[in-house]
A protein has these predicted regions:
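Conserved non-cysteine loop/helix-boundary elements of the Radical SAM core domain that shape
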Residues: 24-221
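Canonical Radical SAM [4Fe-4S] cluster-binding loop centered on the CxxxCxxC motif
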Residues: 5-36
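Flexible, acidic/Gly-rich N-terminal and inter-domain linker regions that tether
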Residues: 1-3
């Protein structure tokens, strides 16, 4: 009853996926603002640490956006601040959304490992290249596979993978293919989301571009 969960948001991504309605900006356009954002975030974390007093977090989750749009040194600075500001002696899980394979590097994963991250998420959403291109993901299926294998090589033994069902132009056979490839990687957890296109998503804003594409939007049901 005395514990709490801490969520830390990094509102930057390599690119903005067409289905996404989260508050996130393309990192290429905001790269010169990231250090200022981190300065403000760290100031807030220090204040929260003082407010927490003797209370200890049960879980810490660093999400976004895509936290690994930060450079390795920036990740190290952020995670080190969390470790210094809060008593993590009773922490059950420390998760970082490693996220998109096009932002994962050995150096960044090593920074996560150094700071005691116990769980990461590698999120392809689909293992069909055509769909990745349609939804604006600038990575390949093989990038996903290699990023996952790299994380295993570096000793991460609790890896989640996020998938979305109902993406544009995907069939049941495409989903089966995705699941077969994911099964071969043997992640420790798989999170399945159904596509829910909200008003801030590009699929809504530019809906004429996607009007002839088949998709299953659970937001309409």
């Amino acid at each position: 009853s005395e514990g709490f969960s801490l969520y830390v948001g990094i509102p930057f991504c390599p690119s903005i996926c067409s289905y996404c309605s989260f508050s996130s900006s393309p990192v290429g356009e905001w790269k010169d603002k990231i250090d200022a954002y981190l300065d403000a975030l760290i100031k807030e974390l220090k204040a929260l640490g003082r407010m927490a007093g003797e209370r200890k977090p049960d879980t810490v989750y660093v999400g976004g956006g895509t936290p690994t749009t930060l450079e390795a040194g920036q990740l190290d600075r952020l995670l080190g601040t969390i470790r210094n500001c809060f008593d993590l002696s009773e922490l059950k899980e420390f998760t970082v959304e490693a996220g998109r394979p096009d932002s994962i590097t050995r150096e960044k994963l090593m920074a996560l490992k150094k700071n005691g991250i116990s769980r990461i998420s590698v999120n392809p959403q689909t293992m069909k290249q055509q769909t990745l291109d349609i939804i604006g993901r600038h990575h390949t299926v093989d990038d996903t596979i290699q990023s996952f294998k790299l994380a295993r090589e570096l000793g991460f033994d609790n890896i989640n993978m996020d998938l979305i069902m109902g993406l544009p132009e995907e069939t049941l056979d495409d989903v089966r293919h995705t699941m077969e490839l994911v099964k071969e990687l043997a992640p420790d957890n798989v999170t399945i989301h159904s596509l829910a296109v909200k008003r801030a998503a590009r699929l809504t804003i530019f809906k004429d571009r996607y009007s002839d594409m088949q998709m299953i939007n659970t937001q309409e049901h």
